[in-house]
Regions:
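N-terminal interaction modules that seed assembly of large macromolecular complexes
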Residues: 15-52
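Short, charged early-sequence alpha-helical segments and their helix-coil boundaries
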Residues: 47-64
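Short alpha-helical segments enriched in small residues
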Residues: 3, 7
Length: 144
């Protein structure tokens, strides 16, 4: 266990420095590249914070969907491997038409949607927030 600042805090501080101190002082392609660097640091920070719990949730959901016993995995690497294998199995079932109809289709859509949302929580949470806001507005319009 490391003392503070944590790796996440260091990445967030570095990203803030790039945005506040460097980006305003440069122009053109270099400014764009600096913004990309800050964004990458924030993505890595979110991944460090969120990847383990999100991977555990994904493995559990895929195991339930595919009717496997939920594996008791401890390392993040093992979770990644299990998620990839079950993801490939689900992909094969979808390609075979197993999710074209019936109640399982709804379950598949729910699991896939959650997986995409979890990936967006790391890669681009603002997109996810905007999507949720748009869906909420559409739902409200339908209720009127």
């Amino acid at each position: 266990m490391q003392d503070r600042p944590t790796s996440v805090e260091l990445l967030e501080a570095a990203a803030d420095f790039v945005d506040r101190e460097l980006v305003p002082t440069i122009e053109g392609a270099r400014q764009f590249q600096a913004r990309v660097v800050a964004n990458v640091m924030r993505i890595v920070a979110r991944e460090i914070k969120l990847e383990d719990p999100l991977a555990r949730s994904e493995v559990k959901a895929l195991a339930r969907l595919l009717e496997h016993d939920a594996p008791h995995l401890h390392s993040l690497d093992d979770l990644r491997v299990a998620a990839a294998r079950m993801g490939e199995e689900l992909t094969a079932k979808i390609r075979a038409g197993d999710a074209d109809g019936g109640s399982w289709r709804g379950e598949v859509l729910a699991v896939v949607r959650q997986s995409v949302e979890d990936k967006l929580r790391i890669a681009n949470p603002r997109y996810l927030e905007n999507d949720i806001a748009v869906r909420g507005a559409e739902k409200a319009r339908k209720e009127i």
